[in-house]
């Protein structure tokens, strides 16, 4: 008999024997009670100096045991988190392939990837919070390529590292301040988009031409009123913890300021992004969109709307538009202006509770003007994705997705089609 069958038989047998065992247990208990009652009638208590000495010795031994347990408890508590520290984690695994990957230096083979994340939050006053995120991951080359960059990609060769760290504290009732050696500027915004990508980072935050890839030393403020108006500003310096120090001339620095209005069902916001020596804007960009000066002024407009009820044919809608102007461009034919846009639709609770259907389209950051005038060379790049995400239980999420694009780099032949399955485990 196989092990699984033996387990089934054993379980069934135990379930049949349980009532009999319970009845037998009742009989024994009644008999023990009768025996105890008879013994009370036949015996009289007896107490002398030997009994006292023995009982006193037992008490002393028990006290010693209690003291030993107290020491062990203190040692145990010394090795645990404080009562104000919480930890949660997430493991993500995926596998997929991209047809056409060889056209932009990727691979058409089936490749996998994973990330493992641990989040620690500690409050010292009840109103503040120290956030630390530890993360590791590794993935195939096609999930690191900027054209097909997976939404969960973390490329640090299996090393568990400090990925985020900042301290948040209130300044009065409406203002929140934050400072840290590893802040991410968009974590400090009023949420600009509610579309959650199912495959590609290109769709994150409503398009990330002005957002993202900014983790480093920084600080900022966020001001939110009860009427829905909010303002956020922060600065990140990627060279502050290196030899040149804070705000050194050669450092990559990014300063973002956002103003937003948010209600229960819709949101609009505008963000000004001032970047110096900055190049981390190419997760959703064409070849011309990447070949830009390192100093820029960018504007990001975002909006979203959601229906009153989920489970209907009316989706949530998220839109984004980004434009960038580059300074210090002197070479003829180099990009001086570029823009991008994104539209995302989400249907929730359509087949089962907590599921999600997502469809999104984006034009990657593309050149609209070049130094000296003339043709930009852009051919109308487009990228799209579609996915279905469902939860087998409260801690798991499975997301099969397809995605594709045409002319994603610069040539009319740069077309791709991909598919993958992503699994998330939260704990």
List the model feature ranges, each with a label.
Residues 126-130, 174-177, 227-233, 265-270, ...:
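Repeated loop/turn-to-beta-strand initiation elements of outer-membrane beta-barrel proteins
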Residues 222, 233-310, 323-328:
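Membrane-embedded translocation segments of transport machinery
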Residues 2-104:
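N-terminal periplasmic/intermembrane-space "pro-region" immediately following the signal or transit peptide
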Residues 67-82, 117-126, 170-175, 225-227, ...:
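Outer-membrane beta-barrel proteins
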Residues 94-100, 139-141, 186-188, 236-246, ...:
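Sequence/structural signature of outer-membrane beta-barrel proteins
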Residues 415-427:
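Outer-membrane beta-barrel "beta-signal"
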Residues 84, 90, 105-240, 259-262, ...:
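Outer membrane beta-barrel
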């Amino acid at each position: 008999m196989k092990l699984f069958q033996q387990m089934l038989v054993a379980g069934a047998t135990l379930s049949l024997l349980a009532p009999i065992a319970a009845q037998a247990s009742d009989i024994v208990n009644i008999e023990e009670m009768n025996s105890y009652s008879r013994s009370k009638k036949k015996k009289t208590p007896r107490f002398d100096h030997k009994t006292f000495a023995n009982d006193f010795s037992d008490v002393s031994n028990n006290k010693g045991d209690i003291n030993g347990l107290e020491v062990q408890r203190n040692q145990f508590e010394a090795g645990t988190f404080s009562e104000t520290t919480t930890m949660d984690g997430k493991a993500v695994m995926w596998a997929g392939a991209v047809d056409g990957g060889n056209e932009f230096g990727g691979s058409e083979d089936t490749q996998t990837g994973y990330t493992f994340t641990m989040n620690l939050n500690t409050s010292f006053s009840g109103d503040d919070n120290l956030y630390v995120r530890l993360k590791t991951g590794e993935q195939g080359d096609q999930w690191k390529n900027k054209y097909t960059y997976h939404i969960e990609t973390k490329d640090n060769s299996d090393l568990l590292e400090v990925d985020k760290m900042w301290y948040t504290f209130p300044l009065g009732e409406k203002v929140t301040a934050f400072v840290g050696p590893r802040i991410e500027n968009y974590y400090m915004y009023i949420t600009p988009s509610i579309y959650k990508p199912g495959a590609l980072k290109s769709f994150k935050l409503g398009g990330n031409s002005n957002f993202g890839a900014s983790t480093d030393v920084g600080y900022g403020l966020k001001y939110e009123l009860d009427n829905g108006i909010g303002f956020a500003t922060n600065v990140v310096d990627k060279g502050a913890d290196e030899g040149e120090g804070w705000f050194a001339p050669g450092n990559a620095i990014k300063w973002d300021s956002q103003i937003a209005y948010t209600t229960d069902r819709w949101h609009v916001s505008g963000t000004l992004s001032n970047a110096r020596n900055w190049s981390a804007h190419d997760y959703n960009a064409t070849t011309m969109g990447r070949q830009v000066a390192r100093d820029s002024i960018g504007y990001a407009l975002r909006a979203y709307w959601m229906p009153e009820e989920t489970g209907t044919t009316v989706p949530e809608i998220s839109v984004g538009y980004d434009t960038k102007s580059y300074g210090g461009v002197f070479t003829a034919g180099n990009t001086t202006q570029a823009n991008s846009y994104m539209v995302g639709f989400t249907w929730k609770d359509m087949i089962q509770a907590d599921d999600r259907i997502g469809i999104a389209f984006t034009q990657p950051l593309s050149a609209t003007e070049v130094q000296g005038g003339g043709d930009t060379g852009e051919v109308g790049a487009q990228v799209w994705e579609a996915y279905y995400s469902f939860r087998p239980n409260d801690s798991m999420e499975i997301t099969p997705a397809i995605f594709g694009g045409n002319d994603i780099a610069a040539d009319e032949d740069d077309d791709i089609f991909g598919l993958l399955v992503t699994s998330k485990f939260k704990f």
